[in-house]
Design a protein with these regions (language model features):
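C-terminal "exit" segments of structured domains
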Residues: 161-230
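Extracellular beta-sheet repeat scaffolds used for adhesion and glycan interaction
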Residues: 28-31, 35-41, 92-103, 206-231
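Short regulatory alpha-helical segment in sensory/regulatory domains of signaling proteins that mediates
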Residues: 2-3, 66, 182
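Generic structural signal for alpha-helix termini and adjacent loop/cap motifs
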Residues: 61-65
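VWA/integrin I-like adhesion module and closely mimicked acidic/polar interface patches used
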Residues: 42-49, 53-60, 70-74, 79-181
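Short, flexible, mixed-charge acidic loops at enzyme active sites
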Residues: 23-33, 143, 153
Length: 231
């Protein structure tokens, strides 16, 4: 059965990051939902937190052909601790993991923040969830002061789009809030229309954009709303 095109992919990050073999799945279909759920259940905890590499790998997934044309692109970064690794290059220019794995150094702090800024500047919306570690402290290399992990994420990773959760209920609430934010952003768009047969534009007054007013929407099957308006 065809879905509504709600594509989800999963990236696991610890010492480094790996995209799940499931790739992009349309979770509005039973098969796609099951594939992503299986990938989530297959996750195993491991050492370190390479948030930088996790964000980079998530962003690379948007280059896949089945999602390239989708306008609304979102990344949700879920972490249970401060970042402790980052991506750098060795003496030959090859990508390698940097950091000590037990603390958020200046390089780790800035690498994840710079990657997040680059992602947001490209038009992708970035959310983060701090799970069970909101009060964990991270040293801000710019000031020398310690800030909470929540503040770091909410200021340098997902600006004003960070949620805190301490248990399963809180995690569910966070994802519900993010889902609501994502879907509410789909309520606007651009309509390209043409003049009916027998009507021509002489003065050019129809050129440019026009606001669509007086449109009425009627929800239909599969969450699709049809808007009707009069020219």
């Amino acid at each position: 059965v065809g879905g509504t095109g709600r594509y989800v992919a999963l990236v696991d990050f610890n010492t480094n990051a790996t995209a799940a073999d499931a790739g992009w799945q349309d979770v509005s279909t039973e098969a796609g939902y099951t594939a992503i759920l299986t990938a989530i259940n297959d996750l195993k905890p491991d050492g370190g937190t390479n948030l930088d590499d996790g964000l980079q790998n998530a962003n690379l997934l948007f280059a896949k052909s089945n999602v390239q044309e989708i306008d609304s692109k979102n990344i949700i970064a879920l972490t249970d601790g401060e970042p402790t690794y980052y991506m750098t290059k060795d003496i030959f220019g090859n990508p390698t993991v940097g950091g000590f794995g037990n603390s958020c150094t200046k390089e780790v702090f800035e690498a994840a923040a710079n990657t997040a800024a680059s992602i947001c500047n490209s038009g992708t919306t970035l959310y983060s969830i701090c799970f069970g570690a909101a009060n964990e402290e991270v040293k801000n290399p710019n000031t020398g002061a310690y800030i909470s992990l929540f503040e770091y994420l909410n200021t340098y990773i997902a600006l004003n789009k960070t949620y805190s959760a301490n248990d399963f209920s809180g995690l569910t609430d966070a994802f519900d809030a993010i889902s609501s934010s994502i879907t509410s952003g789909l309520s606007s768009g651009t309509v390209h229309d043409s003049l009916p047969d027998g009507v021509t534009c002489i003065s050019g007054d129809f050129e440019g954009n026009r606001n669509l007013t007086g449109a009425t929407g009627e929800p239909g099957e599969g969450g699709v709303t049809t808007y009707t308006y009069t020219k």
